[in-house]
Amino acid sequence: MNTIKILIGLLGIFLFSLSGIVSAQSDATTQLSQLLSNFRTYQAKFNQITFDGQDRVIQQSHGRVMIMRPGRFRWETDSPTKQIIITNGKTLWVYDVDLSQATQQPLAQKTNINPASLLSGSVKDLKQKFTITISPTPDAATFQLVPNLGKSLNFNWIRLKFSKKQLTEMTVLNNLDERSIFQFSQIKVNAPLSSTLFEFKPSRGIDVVKQ
């Protein structure tokens, strides 16, 4: 399973800055939905490490992520291989730089979870799609989201850690019992981003495969 592709469908729901420390007594789903209105853009560098079911490291990568509401993502992996994933909310591009190959496909609008539906920030939608709990500490909070659709989404749960009012870590456990941890740094919220960052125009020599 490609954890990066799962995150493309999920990341937009989480990229915002907290307006304050989260209260344990408040409803986690409502808090998460309310916080969606706090961001327009998000930029960060990331480091990823993936463990198998025996806690052995099976993958490491790093790069950067950019998001602009509604529905626009750019995920660049620099190592171990260079890959760029872009969506403008309508089309999804996956560009493997070393192979000079890109795949192009429509971004599904009828699937149960996709960036457009998650970015809506609707409490009703969140409750339909996830069971959400929260574990607060004096200076941080962690949300856990368990999909109500079960194994059809290829992951068991996702956890989001917020420190100093920003999302700093994301953990995904997939159905193969592989755990991927993404740590975010050099975070910028609501800084200007050009819409051209979320469009892909292949240069000459790039093989384009349409799906």
From Swiss-Prot:
Signal peptide: 1-26
One GO term (biological process): lipoprotein transport
Keyword Iron: no
Recorded GO CC terms: outer membrane-bounded periplasmic space
Keywords: Chaperone, Periplasm, Protein transport, Signal, Transport
SUPFAM superfamilies assigned: Prokaryotic lipoproteins and lipoprotein localization factors
Disulfide bonds: none
InterPro entries: LolA/LolB/LppX, OM_lipoprot_carrier_LolA-like, OM_lipoprot_carrier_LolA_Pbac
CDD domains: LolA (cd16325)
Protein name as catalogued: Outer-membrane lipoprotein carrier protein
